[in-house]
């Protein structure tokens, strides 16, 4: 039976409602509430925790870790301690049956017993091998796996290499997504634990399976988050030690990789070039393994990085575009940098596709060129008259004032949609770029992912009500959070927000004092701030950026007055 899909933690108690009785056939690990266990995480490492809830139907446990965080962990990723009296009971098949050639062997470390055929790879019989003691696969991986790469020397490194020649699960039986980035069974790497492809994992070029950094023994430097600029071949495909080769990076790839790594670690969207981007790159210059770029003098690194950030508008967004400091840079989309297929004499011709999120080999965004449309021509007898590009003929734009005013009128006259069933309706701004960080959009009642991970990319801060987003744009502070409007708005902000409320059918209209936001936009107020009627009467240009329905049924619009632009 296939493992159930990855579950999410929820604050509601309905997650632990009595479920249907679990089937009695098949092995069942002995897990109970209050038991201390080791849980394997998405980084390939084991962490100590205590079981709080056991769900036999879903085969998951709610585990509380040493930092008081609680997450759901699949049974297959939990390693309990051996119990007294079970020395003759196989911890895999839960059977005491012994036949010739398939005897029970006990691990010297954890004292768990295994049938020879139940262990992967097959365990030696008692008395066989170099010594009389034997260590199981779980203990070897628990000792040898490390952040930055597993042990490369010593007896446990040699034992781990022998264990890695076979996988503890069927690779062909995994259900992968379209991009071959994640599978339904949450089985990755040599350890068989969970994982996230964009967080320090390497993909084998032959079998396309993903492997944790902590379980590999071939890396000379630790990985950065989202770094896929490697040719990697696992022990299973090679039948021996792993093989890895660094791909050549360009300056745009270096800038993208550094920004993605910083955004994952710091949970921010924008970073100062002189205070964060350049110092991080300089301090980790040798660890980046830049190949030909590593010989770049220190004086040229700043100009090369800055040029890459400014010349690739499809990847990066600067603070100048959002009315912030021009030295701030962020990613348009929080995705790892795309990887080109290897080329040249050192490239392997059998390198398959599947590096990009879409399943094919991703090309660098900076080199995409759209074919320009040919100009329209009108044929007449004896001559051909040029009409210009198609957009200039077919889409003759109206004057800006008329077009924006018509847009506002259509938005205001639109029918009111029914209120959202969720009391926390997230706000989304203009289509294009979302200024709010991903973690800040996780409201207190929204579930988080099951395997959030202990690395800096995972945090439960988004689920606590007293933690707000670390950085908000002035526009977002006004429309999304009217209760914490700053006393003085920046002078560079030219957009203001207007609230237009309409009662929903069947819902009584609530009488409440106007918020500071509504008072600041009401007609007749001082300070040179006019309401929507005043702007329309003066003929000022207007643009509707967004529309949302509040829990009480009222409709609010985010309106930009005066022709200023933030995008």
Swiss-Prot record:
Listed GO MF terms: chromatin binding; DNA binding; histone H3K36me3 reader activity; histone H3K4me3 reader activity; histone methyltransferase binding; identical protein binding; methylated histone binding; transcription corepressor binding
Tissue: Highest levels in heart, skeletal muscle, and pancreas, lower levels in brain, placenta, lung, liver and kidney.
SMART domains per the UniProt record, alphabetical: PHD, TUDOR
A GO-annotated cellular component: centrosome
Coiled coil (residue ranges): none
SUPFAM superfamilies: FYVE/PHD zinc finger (SSF57903), Tudor/PWWP/MBT (SSF63748)
Tree of life domain: Eukaryota
Record field: compositional bias (Low complexity): 423-433, 456-470, 488-510
Main location: nucleus
Zinc finger (PHD-type): 87-142, 186-240
Matches recorded under Pfam families: Mtf2_C, PHD, Tudor_2
Biased segments, Basic and acidic residues type: 371-386
Record's disease association: A chromosomal aberration involving PHF1 may be a cause of endometrial stromal tumors. Translocation t(6;7)(p21;p22) with JAZF1. Translocation t(1;6)(p34;p21) with MEAF6.
Purpose: Polycomb group (PcG) that specifically binds histone H3 trimethylated at 'Lys-36' (H3K36me3) and recruits the PRC2 complex. Involved in DNA damage response and is recruited at double-strand breaks (DSBs). Acts by binding to H3K36me3, a mark for transcriptional activation, and recruiting the PRC2 complex: it is however unclear whether recruitment of the PRC2 complex to H3K36me3 leads to enhance or inhibit H3K27me3 methylation mediated by the PRC2 complex.
Protein name as annotated: PHD finger protein 1
Species of origin: Homo sapiens
The gene coding this protein: PHF1
